[in-house]
Amino acid sequence: MSYLDHCGVYVKDLENSLAFYKEIFGWKEKTRWTSGEAKIAVLDMGKGLMELVQRPGSPGAPPGGNWTHLAIHVNDFTDKVRKLEEKGLELRKVTMGEGAHIAFFKDPDGHTVEIMEKGLSL
């Protein structure tokens, strides 16, 4: 069976992005390395990995990028919303059919992130 192993995103400031995702989601840093001028760190999300890549001139979320958003299933939706609001982030909250709650926000690099109580795979 095939599955998604990790997603990789460009970031402007590796340390800032690591701190953001660790604080909001409690993810742990799995490893980090350099490749040429690139600094790379991998976060363990529990059921998959997120690779953060900082290169000289990394744009963060490129205008008109090739992906729309990163969707993250959380067990503590209300707590995550509270943490994000405390950080001053603007949230777009939506209630889907059957009472599933989701919220969209921008991470420090402008990537659209979705948090959800019930994932598509559940």
Where are these regions (language model features)?
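N-terminal beta-strand motif that seeds the catalytic metal site of vicinal oxygen chelate
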Residues: 1-15, 67-72, 119-122
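Amphipathic alpha-helical segments
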Residues: 13-28
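Residues at or immediately preceding the N-termini of alpha-helices
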Residues: 14, 77-78
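Conserved short beta-strand elements that form part of the metal-binding/catalytic scaffold
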Residues: 28-64, 112-119
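Vicinal oxygen chelate
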Residues: 30, 42, 81-122
